[in-house]
């Protein structure tokens, strides 16, 4: 009798978990083309950058090999755009994070101070300008993408800029100078719920 009760209890738990998993799968939001593969659903994302110093790199990534995220800077003083390149088989990946000062959602701007961080994921190496006085976004444009209604808004963000000072490791023992950068990436902004 105890075995039957245990078997029924186990079967009931399995059925409950299966129903819950199916319900969760039905309510999960569908992946957009941009998040399923590549940076932008339109297929025209890119990052070009000339990097000199501790490493010499000429980056030329196209939409399908990139991962793009972004939104407001944590302090609300502008926008943050993160663009990662193709992941290597050993998990290593190069990521650029641009913190663009004084830029509002949807605005086309020029001559904006920019903080730049270059991250070598999987290698524990990070280079940062540690301020927005070494890099400048010459021009920046934004174009609304995706659904127009609802609390979430997505923007295609295109920028062209340069750095006059290097990004350094936190210990200061190595430096990278990104003499030129051009990118088209994405930011996603969400309205906060009332009362927050």
Predicted features and spans:
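Bacterial N-terminal signal peptides that target proteins for export
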Residues: 1-11
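Exposed boundary/loop context
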Residues: 2-3, 38, 46, 115, ...
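C-terminal motif of bacterial Sec signal peptides marking the signal peptidase cleavage site
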Residues: 20-21
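Acidic, glycine-rich flexible loop segments
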Residues: 111-187
């Amino acid at each position: 009798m105890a075995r039957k009760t245990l078997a029924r209890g186990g079967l009931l738990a399995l059925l409950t978990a299966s129903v819950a998993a199916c319900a969760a799968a039905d309510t999960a939001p569908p992946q957009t083309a941009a998040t399923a593969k590549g940076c932008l659903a339109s297929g025209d994302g890119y990052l070009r950058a000339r990097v000199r110093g501790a490493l010499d790199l000429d980056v030329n990534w196209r939409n399908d090999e990139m991962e793009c995220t972004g939104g407001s800077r944590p302090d609300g003083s502008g926008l943050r755009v993160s663009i990662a390149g193709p992941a290597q088989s050993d998990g290593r990946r190069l990521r650029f994070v641009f913190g663009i000062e004084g830029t509002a959602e949807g605005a086309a701007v020029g001559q904006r101070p920019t903080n730049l961080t270059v991250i070598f994921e999987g290698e524990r190496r990070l280079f940062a300008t540690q301020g927005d006085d070494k890099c400048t976004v010459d021009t920046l444009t934004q174009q609304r993408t995706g659904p127009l209604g609802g609390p979430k808004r997505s923007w295609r963000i295109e920028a062209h800029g340069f750095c006059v000072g290097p990004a350094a490791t936190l210990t200061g023992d190595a430096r990278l100078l990104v003499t030129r950068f051009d990118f088209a990436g994405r930011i996603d902004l969400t309205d906060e719920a009332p009362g927050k």
